[in-house]
Regions:
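Bacterial N-terminal signal peptides
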Residues: 8-17
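Detector for the c-type heme attachment site
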Residues: 43-50, 66, 80
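Bacterial N-terminal signal peptides that target proteins for export
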Residues: 1-8
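The canonical Cys-X-X-Cys-His
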Residues: 32, 39-47, 100
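Electrostatic cytochrome c docking/interface patches
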Residues: 17-35
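Extracytoplasmic electron-transfer domains, predominantly the class I c-type cytochrome c fold
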Residues: 57-105
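Short, solvent-exposed mixed-charge patches
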Residues: 109-110
Length: 110
C-alpha cells in the first residue's frame, strides 16, 4: 500500500508541474459527489470522513485528495488515462472529469 502511494504521489507531482489549462476549470462539487456515489462508491469510499473502501485495495477519495502533488491536472490525467489495471474502463466527459475532480479536491477541507 505504501509503495502504491509513493508511486501515485510521484506521478501526481510530475503532472502538478503542468501549467494551468482547460482541464483545471472548476467543476461542480455536488454533481461530482453524486457521480462518485453513483459510479465510484462500489469500490471507493467516496463520502467525506469515510476511510474504508468497499474494495480493500481501492483508496478512499479522501486519501486520493490528500495525496501530495494532487492537482486538477493530475486528477484529469488519472481519470482519463485509463491505464490503471483494476479500474473499470470508464469514459468520462470533460465536464464529468471536472466535477469529480472538484468533489475530490473539496475533501481536503475535511
Amino acid at each position: 500500500m505504501r509503495m502504491r502511494t509513493l508511486i501515485v504521489s510521484a506521478v501526481f507531482s510530475i503532472f502538478g508541474m503542468v501549467p494551468a489549462s482547460r482541464a483545471q476549470e472548476i467543476g461542480d462539487v455536488q454533481q461530482g459527489r453524486q457521480f462518485a456515489l453513483d459510479v465510484c462508491a462500489s469500490c471507493h469510499a467516496v463520502r467525506a470522513g469515510a476511510t474504508q473502501s468497499p474494495l480493500a485495495t481501492a483508496p478512499s477519495f479522501e486519501e486520493i485528495a490528500h495525496t501530495p502533488g494532487m492537482t486538477p491536472a493530475a486528477l484529469t490525467f488519472w481519470l482519463t488515462a485509463q491505464s490503471h489495471p483494476t479500474m473499470p474502463n470508464l469514459i468520462l466527459s470533460p465536464q464529468q472529469v471536472r466535477n469529480v475532480s472538484a468533489y475530490l479536491l473539496s475533501l481536503r477541507d475535511n
